């Protein structure tokens, strides 16, 4: 097997090589283009003509609008866990997103954040990623939400993802989503 280091844009160097080779065609690159700076830089530096993205739109259904408006602070970072690409030979048609629980369920009413008729004060016990996403969902519906976390700091176990360099996607998720 070929070792693969998880980078923001692991295939950009190959696209850049193709671009420099003098091919008379537009060169596109896919893989890891989630952050606006990476997209802008790759095109501005002439490394590619087109940037392709899929997971950025899965974790952020409004990615195009966020990009156009320059609202990178509103991005939900993709963990690149590949759960959106199917779950193996026994369940190839089931696809989910670790950071966008609505993905794949958009047409099912109970998963959508419709405004509530009666606002409630709701306590969410636990301030890990699941508790925080639940709080966001409930707040989006119009409820008043309070998160109770025993540790005094939000994030749960993901707070400890800083110390392993190859877990940078979790660190990005923590740093950008848990603020």
Name each model-derived stretch.
Residues 1, 156-163:
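Gly-rich Lys/Arg/Thr-decorated short loops/hinges at beta-loop-alpha junctions or inter-strand turns
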Residues 1-125, 129-145, 153:
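Flavin-dependent oxidoreductase catalytic cores
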Residues 74-75, 79-80, 160-179:
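N-terminal glycine-rich dinucleotide-binding loop that anchors FAD/FMN and/or NAD(P) in oxidoreductases
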